[in-house]
UniProtKB/Swiss-Prot annotation:
<dbReference type="InterPro" id="IPR005749">
    <property type="entry name" value="Ribosomal_uL15_bac-type"/>
</dbReference>
<keyword id="KW-0699">rRNA-binding</keyword>
<comment type="similarity">
    <text>Belongs to the universal ribosomal protein uL15 family.</text>
</comment>
<dbReference type="GO" id="GO:0006412">
    <property type="term" value="P:translation"/>
</dbReference>
<feature type="compositionally biased region" description="Basic and acidic residues">
    <location>
        <begin position="1"/>
        <end position="13"/>
    </location>
</feature>
<comment type="function">
    <text>Binds to the 23S rRNA.</text>
</comment>
<feature type="compositionally biased region" description="Gly residues">
    <location>
        <begin position="21"/>
        <end position="35"/>
    </location>
</feature>
<dbReference type="GO" id="GO:0022625">
    <property type="term" value="C:cytosolic large ribosomal subunit"/>
</dbReference>
<feature type="region of interest" description="Disordered">
    <location>
        <begin position="1"/>
        <end position="39"/>
    </location>
</feature>
<dbReference type="InterPro" id="IPR021131">
    <property type="entry name" value="Ribosomal_uL15/eL18"/>
</dbReference>
<dbReference type="GO" id="GO:0003735">
    <property type="term" value="F:structural constituent of ribosome"/>
</dbReference>
<dbReference type="GO" id="GO:0019843">
    <property type="term" value="F:rRNA binding"/>
</dbReference>
<dbReference type="InterPro" id="IPR001196">
    <property type="entry name" value="Ribosomal_uL15_CS"/>
</dbReference>
<comment type="subunit">
    <text>Part of the 50S ribosomal subunit.</text>
</comment>
<dbReference type="Pfam" id="PF00828">
    <property type="entry name" value="Ribosomal_L27A"/>
</dbReference>
<keyword id="KW-0689">Ribosomal protein</keyword>
<keyword id="KW-0694">RNA-binding</keyword>
Length: 157
């Protein structure tokens, strides 16, 4: 067998239907599009329109709202911070702040602050000055000999 002998098995492929090539073909003239009207024309797709039937987005009830005061925190795990310390990207003696994490490449941008979560283990003794931290994360940080400074309101979380 040679490369030029290779071909698909019989019946594996179908030749495409050639539309609009005379009425004898069975799909000539209107080419399977019916008669006139918007859908017979080219370039038609009305998103969300279901032919007059009440569309799905109107059948479902409205729910919820967007809180304009919602804070969006960047989430960082303890494991990710420990990796940065091990790789010497984050100074273990300096305070860990949002700006320090951006400079170390741990996070890309600070939205409304950084929230530390307890994923992974923390071996380094670090001082944190962040917008938020989970209770478990605070426990792990203090167990490693570090400290956490939170804003007044976030401390009640």
């Amino acid at each position: 067998m040679k490369l030029n002998d290779l071909r698909d098995k019989d019946g594996a492929t179908h030749s495409k239907k050639r539309l609009g090539r005379g009425i004898g073909s069975g799909s000539g003239k209107t080419a399977g599009r019916g008669v006139k009207g918007q859908k017979a024309r080219s370039g038609v797709a009305i998103n969300g329109f279901e032919g007059g039937q009440m569309p799905l987005y109107r059948r479902l009830p409205k729910r919820g709202f967007n809180n304009i005061f919602a804070k969006s925190f960047v989430v960082v795990s303890l494991a990710r911070i420990q990796e940065a310390v091990d790789a010497k990207k984050l100074d273990a003696k300096a305070t860990v702040t949002a700006e320090a994490l951006v400079a170390a490449g741990v996070i890309r941008r600070v939205k409304d602050g950084v929230r530390v979560l307890s994923d992974g283990e923390l071996k380094a003794k670090l001082a944190f000055d962040v917008a938020g931290a989970s209770k478990a994360a605070i426990e792990k940080i203090e167990k490693a000999g570090g400290s956490v400074k939170l804003p007044e309101k976030a401390a009640a979380e």
